[in-house]
Structures are given as C-alpha cells and as structure tokens.
C-alpha cells in the first residue's frame, strides 16, 4: 500500500478572555492542545507565532506541544482581558495514497481548551503546576478542499462562568512522499499485554514505488532501462492527478477565502495572491506528464509538480495569515457567522402554535397529548439524528441530537395565524384597516372545513427587510398580530380550499397622450367593463384593488413556497406605456392620493385541486375584464410529481398620469433542486442549477426588453424539450453544492441576492421546461402582448442592423411555434372555435419587426451586485471557451477583445449555444466577472514560475524541509538516512530552481468547469443598501462555508466533500419526511426568516438602544438563593448587549423561603423599592423572572399598593415552573409525601398555602384570593414555562390550565376552574397582553433526580442548552 505524507496547519488565535461571573479573584491562564485520531499515524508540532505586545511577567510558552497562554489577573466583574496569543499546530499525517482526500477528511481533530487558576503567587513560578478548574473540548470539522475558517466563543462551566474567544484557520499545506517516521499503534496481544507503539521508518519506500505502485520493480542500473507496464503508468497518472487536484483545491479555497475577506474588509493590509484555475492547471500538469515515457522522467516530473504546488500553497497560506491574523474586523465577521449558524441550529425542534385568546380557558388535553407524542417521535426520528454539527462545536454548550431539548410554544393572540398572508410591506400598517382580506368568490368551489394555505411575499427586497416579525393574518378575518409567519400544517395535505382574491380596478383618468421613448403608444381601450366588487374587508367594506387570486404551484426549492408568475394587469381607460417605465419604489403598502389605488405585492399560496386549464377558464370567466397577461407560467412540479398546489405572483400598480409601470416575472422550472430550504433561511442555488431569477421581479425599461424576455423564455423552452433531460428533484449529481443556512443560510439571506447572482450564472445542467399550451394560451388571452410587440416596429428602427439576422431568427422560430400551437388550439374541448384564435394575426403581425431587430445584444442587465462595466450576465461557459480557444494567446490577453466575445456570447440567438444532448455530461459553475475570467485564461502565465518568484519559493520549501528534518532529528537521533534525504530534497529543489518557463501544451479534454476560479454564491459581495430596521450585522454574509456544519452545502470549489453534501441533503430529506408524517398543527421556528437573536455575544461595539433602565427582577424558589438564576441573567445579558438591563437578583428571602407568602412579599417589594431608590434608577420598564415558588411571590407583589406606581412599566413576566394553581392535583405521590413531611418539619406557611390547607374554605385560601386580584394583565408578555417531566410542580399548574382530574372533581374542581378564570380572563380582555405557554421536553439522564422529577424542575435554571435555545430562538424577543 502506497502512503503519502500530508501536512495540515491550524492557526489558532486566543483573542479575549471575558469574565462573565467568576467567583474568585486571582491568576488565570488558558492552555490549548490539539489532538488527532490515534488510528491515523501522525506527528504534531506546536509553536507560538511572534509576540508583538508585552506579554508581562508570565509570557506564553509551549510545553510538550501544549501552548500556555500568558498569565493574567482577574480583579473585577465583567472584566475583559486581551490575550492575543497566536499559535500554530502542524499535523503531519501518514495517509493511504489511494484515498488521500477521504483519509484527510476522516481525521478527528479536537482542540482542547483548559482553564487554570491560582490565587497563590508561589505557584506562578511553575506554570505547569497551576491547577485545572475547567475544560472544554472543541470538535474541528476539517475538509482539505475547503479548509476551516471559523470563530467561536467558548464558555466554561456553570461554576466558572467565563468565555475565551477563539479563531481557527486551518488548511492543507503539503502532500509528498513520507519524509519522517511515524509511530504506529499495535493491537494488544491475546495474552492481554498492553500494546506497544512500533516505530517504522517509512522513508525507505522509494518514490518510484509510490508513483508506480507496489507492482513496480526498479531494475539495477547494470541491466539497462526498464519499461513499466501500462497499469503502472496509469497508476502514476492517477496518483499524480489526485494529489495535484487536492493541492489545487486547497489552494483555490484558500485564495477564495482571502479574496472574500478583502471584499468585505477592503482596508486590510494584504498581499496579492496569484490565481491558479484548478481545472486548467490540472489539465496542463497532467498533459505535460503524459508526454513523458521514461519512468525516471515521470517520477522526476511528479516530484517537480508536487514541489511547485506545495510552494505555491505555502506562500498563499503565509500571505493569508498575514492578512487575517488578529484583525478585529475579520474576527467580528466570523463571530457573526458562527452566531447565526448556532441560533439557526437551535431553532430546530422548536415548535410554535397560535390559538385564539379564549382558547386559553379551555381544556386542551388533545394538544398536550399530541405534543407529548410528537416529542417522543422526534427523539427517535431521523430528523433529529441527522442534525449536522457546527464547523467547530462543543457538545457541552452546543449539544447534539441526543441532548438538545424539544420545545413547544403555544401563543394565545387576538387573531391566530393558522393560514397566513405574510407581506413585509404590511409589517407596520398605518392602521389596522390597511390589512384587508377578501371573501371567497361564489364562483369557486370551496371545500368545507378545509384550510387555506399560506400566502407569502416574494418581492425582491422584502425577505431582507424584517424590521420585526411580519404581520400575518388569518384568511377571511380582519385582524393582525405580530410574530413569525412561515410554517407548515400537515393536515393541509388532506384538505384543500379555493379561496379567491379578485382584483378590482377603478378606472383612472386617461392622459391626453402617453408615448414611450421610442414613439410606441399603447392603447388598452378594448376592455370597457368595470370589475365587480368581490374583495371586501370585514371591518371596513372598501375596495382592495390589486389583489387577484390565481392558482399557483409549489416551488421546487421549498414545498411551502410557490413558484412565481407575474401578471401585468391594467384597466379600461388607462393608457400604459411600457417604455421608460419603472417599478414602484416603495416596498410598503402605499396609497395613491389621486386615484385611490393601493399597491400590493404578494404570492397567494393555496392548496387547490384544479389544473392550469381550469385556471385559464377561471380567468376568462371573471366578470372583471381586466387585461391579464401571464407571460410565462411554471409547470415544474406537474412534470415532476402530481401536485395540487399552484403559485402565481400578482401585481397591481398605482397608475396615474405621470407614472407608468411594467413588470415581468415568470416561474420557470428547475430540473435539479439545488436548494433544500432549511430553517427558514433563504437557501442559495446550486452552482450548477438554474438560479431562480424568473421567480423574482425585474423592471423592463422598454418594449424591447419585454420582447427579449419572451424570446429568452421561448428559447429555454425549446432547448429543454430538445434535450429532454430531467433530474431528480430530491437528489443532486456529483459536484452540486446546495446551501442550507447557515449562514447564508442564515436568516438574513435576501431574495434579491439570489436574483442578482442569477445574472452572473446560467447553468444548462438543469434545463427549463414550460408547458407550451399554457404559455401560449395565456399569451393569446390578451391583446396587450400583440400591441407590445407591434410597437417594437417603431422602437427597433433606431437599432443597429448588424444583429438583425440573429433577432429575426428569434421571431421566426417563435412565430412557427405559435402557428403550430394555434393549429392545435383552434378549437376548444367542445368543438367551438377558441375566441383567442382571433388574436393570432395581431400577435404574429406584431411579433416580426421589419428588418431592424438589433435589440437583443443591446440588452444589458442592471446588476447592482457587479458595478464593473466588464462584468456580464448569463453566459454559457462553452460559448466563451469556444470563442476564446479560437483566438490566439495575444488576443486572449487583450481585454477589449474579450468583451466582444462576451457580448456575442451574451446575445440570445435562435440556435442553441450548446449541444443540448451533452448537457448532462458537462459540469457548470458560477461565472465569475468577465475581467477575472479572462485574466485566468492565459494558462501559461498562471502556472509558470517566474524568475522573480523562484527565490521566495525556494526559501519557503527550504524552510519546510528544514523543519521536517529538525522534527526527525529530535525524535530519532540514531537515524542514518537523514542526510541522504536532504540530498534528495536538495536535488529536487535545484530542479525547481532551473525550471524554465513552462511551454504551452495543447489542452486535451479540458473540462468546461472552472469552479475553483469562480465566486460561490455564499461569498458574493452584497451591495444592496441596508434596509431600516434590519440589523446590519444580520446582513453580513459569511466568508466561507464549512462542509459539515454550516447548514448548507457550499460551492467553494469543484471538489467539495460529497459526504458533507450527502449529510446536508439527508438532513433536509429527513426533515421533509418528518414534516409529511407529522400529525401536528404547528410550525417550526427553523422555518422563520428572523429569530430572536441576531447579534453575537460580545459584539465589538455595543450601542445603547434604550433611554431608560430596563429593570429585571429575578426571584428564586423554595429553599433557593440569589444565585439560582445566574445563567438566566447571563444569557439575557449576553443576548441583549446594549439593552440597558439592570438585574436585581433577589436575596431577601433566601434565608427563609418557608415563611408564608405575605411575609416574603413584603421583603421582595422592600428590596425592589430600595434598589431603585439606592441607585437612583430611571426605570422605563420592569420585567420579572421567577422560578417555582418565586412566581407566586412576584404575583403577590403586583397586588400591593406600594407597587401601584410601577404597574404601567411592567413588560414581561417569565414564569419558570411556577405553581400558580398550587399542588392540588399533583400526580406524584412521592413528591406529595415529601412536601407534607417538609411542611411538618419546617412549619412552612408557604407549603401550607401551596397545598390549599391554609383554610378550610378553599375560596378563602391564599392562592384563590390572589387569583381574584389583578396582576398578569399589566404585562405585555406573560410567558409560562413548564415541563411534564417536572414532578415537583404539576404541569397544568405551571401552565395555568385545566387538568383532567379537576374536571372530574365536583368538590374542588369548580374552585379550580374559578381560579383559572380569575387569572386568565383579565389577560384575555387585555389587548396589550399576550400569553405564551411553553412545553419543554428535556433530554435527561436516567438518574434518581430524573425519576422524582427534580432534574426537570431545576433544568430551567442550570441547563445551558435549554436556556440558550429558549432565549436565542424566541425568549430574547420578550425582553426587547
């Protein structure tokens, strides 16, 4: 077996040490050590990178490959210490030469961080003797073709609350024959003796045997030359290609990350990194090798190539580290990426359901039972088991599928959103009447008892402008509440409804004349009927123009979204000019004061059972004879699966004398679903899938632009049918890298970004197929299309004639297809002549201009992402390559000539640009900007070793080999072959030095793919303006994408880990499968675009967002103390930096929690008032957090007259397992017995009151009388957290709801019911108060504490996983 030595280097930066809540003052330091899998022979070397700052009296050092940070002293609370220690860990690995990439990706790297402390200066003399107090182990998910670039704040345990911020950069830096010896583990013998490590000298393996395989036998020099067999030659070629490809992929990933950093942070000091296109460089290296036949020359050439690539990689790695090391901007950028990924991951297995407020009083036994069953199903489901890890994760603080809690949230609001209209334009309506909804049209067949599906906004910029959770409103009700919108209802598959939203267009004044820039005038006088009033609002019966119901189809990307088709609609009496028109600029709902027209932008998603032919007939039968032109409709899911869902984009524009609008969009099919939506993140398209540009809105500034779009669509349809290639919607071919969200997948992914990027790429690996019948029927439904094209005769007369033949081919082909379609569609199903056929002549006559048709090549996308003039839109790579390969090298270097090629390649001719039959055999990727691509094409320049660079390369290689030699010399002093190795190395280096400029070799079988030189979607620079209300930090796009942990499958280079892709896809598939099988009317937080936390812990700049103080009072429970809620306080402070929070950790009752509630209430209110007066606080809001018994004390405080002044400042009440209804119906005999004994022993008044034994008359008991007093309704949010695993506090008591036993109890049950009504009826009556209940299923070990219910009772206090998940996903929003 041939073996290869690979070297991976990790650069680890310790930035800051944050004292969150350490108990002891003294001296601390952190130790870092790296571990690799013991099953892979390896050698580890740890070094410190140059220290520039004064390290103090106790500098950092390295001892036995463990790096000790400098010693620092902690004296104050919330103290931050700058560490800024940088260390490098080089890992030399002995790998299987036949599967180098797989072997490298299978190495389990673990970074161990230990916190050591001493308060004795005597121990500082020997740092190794300082005791360990806490430790964390981080898993590093490294892949050689993408590297690892991540930042993570590591929090130590509960008793040592502190954080060390760590940045890790990792990259493959070398592959070559083994040069050092490795210790190999030996299995223990059968006698039971411990295994001993056996050192084997691998350097004895000759280079020839590595290259040609074990079958090769080098003859003695006396026997002459030996010709190796064909198998040996092929082995050499493959061995060379695999290693070179891996090194080139690592080089490309490193260069790409470096370029992305500079794009995001252009002010960084940096060195230019030479680009090496992976495919072309690899092809040239392989072709050069294949020209050689002598085995010695082959071996020498392979050694040269590997040495050259190693040198390039080492230089790039050093330049990269110089650029990013200890740079605050880079740290902040990576910090945001990690936080977004982590929050998104926590949002999995977090459900929410909305109910009407009166339902809070009902007995929801079925809901509780379904949540319990679902929790068990999730624990055993593939969905949770397939949850991918973060790029760098710590199981203790990040959790895994086996430890993450499952949470169900029940919201009780004025208008529950089980079916949504989520339009960001309506996020903050001017008044509640602006949210209007239509009744179902009598013309539609509705299914009784069925539920409409969701309606979601898809305007270009809306998904990026989440100022707060969008307004969602239940269909057929006029109401609005705040909260996340997207969701899924799995009962919807069995039921469907056909609700109808019909547009009403009020006739507008006709201007005297409206002419376009080209002189074309468009008259829409054919329609003369007004629309019937169908759309109404319950509260205000006024017209809702612009909202038209159209049946739509589900997206191939996300089954809960819809493919979009835009209808250009106009009304009689309105003269609309398409030239010189603009789309409405406002993203919000606007009212035109002149004509009363209102603009709506949304997609109506409904489950329907009709076909698209029914859709057309429905449109024809509408009384509103508006001119609706469906330019192109999607038939994707009908061709892939039998679906009953359709989608359509509906657009109604305000039209007056001065404003003219033209909108175009279409829903073209994506044969290969490159994106599997996860967690609500707008997923990015694959690098080889057609970007969903047609699902976005585009502005057409002239008639010719509209015709161009028609031509492009028709061309796409023709080619797709000609090729007849279809790919599975659930599986992706090799090389496709879908994205999930991370971070882009992250909540801030904007839909406009997807549209902008689609202008840079066009892949034919996912051919587009549209139904010709539907498209033409829709086109011929209207005269407008004919008039538009007819007007082109005038406007095209000014165009250049050199492209006339190309454009004429378009028109001829389209005309022929239309004629053939008309032949089939002349008669309808009942034999009568189709009324649309009469439009054929108008359409055909207007379709073909005279001879001036130079509109095609002049069309240019206005791409905000690419500001440079030499960037270009959708181009087939094959066309570019063919054009460029036909030119000489000098022309290739000429950028002006290149742009001419691009212009021609961008033109849309009638002939296919590529052979469609070869589509599936060709790999495509994102097209980089033109300048970058053409600079890459001079292959000879890209891979040559210029004389100026030889010296620096020699130096880097000499240093590398000298280091290897030093390592070997230290380990094995008796080694005798070290000198010979250095001689061999020197000979190799001398060969590199004398290497002349590489001559050009004919590129044979050059792949079209140039993925490595192209920018991935995930790293595209974002130039769109920041939208008000949307966090700028949230708008950041991650620098890199990690294969195993970023909740997305990236496209950084052509060799991205397929195993990682499969893992991501398997997770999405498991999630989709789980959704389909789910019998629960709820929604996942992971499907929401915006979650509660968008700012990472310890941001570089904390902006005070509030004027006054937000006082948070934390009250412990029975037999507790003020430190019980430390973690709650910690995660609130970390999650809301700049929120101006002031915490009062109540301690007045910690000495006696067995007193009665009145006494404890007096102490707490005294403590609150004294705290405010002592610190002279200017209170703007007050929130309470109580655990167990503390929740009752808080409610009692609210009833006291002394607190009356603060009632109007109450904000949130967070109840953690609070026995609001006492312990009357506790189902734990053990707990009841324990409480009885404790009450007897302690003479506890509070326990007596909790058990309703403080008075013989239940209605005179403390808890009953407390329920009659006002309190909860003064809060904005009442959040009740409970767990059925908690046996200390009854589940129903913590949630303030009925229980089954109470309904059967005729004596105590009515009193129990009255208590619930007393508590909740004021909450229902208060419009400003929202009640939220949480049902938490903890992942608890099988211990005695779990058995008696104590573990779940205290888990809400000391479980980092629960608290972080709860606050980051939803809880922080209640304190904002």
Swiss-Prot record:
Region (Disordered): 431-489
InterPro entries: AB_hydrolase_fold, DUF3657, DUF676_lipase-like, Lipase-like
Pfam families xref list: DUF3657, DUF676
GO BP term, example: lipid metabolic process
Biased composition (Acidic residues): 431-442
Polar residues bias: start-end ranges: 443-462
Family in the record: Belongs to the FAM135 family.
Official protein name in the record: Protein FAM135B
Organism: Xenopus laevis
Gene name in the database record: fam135b
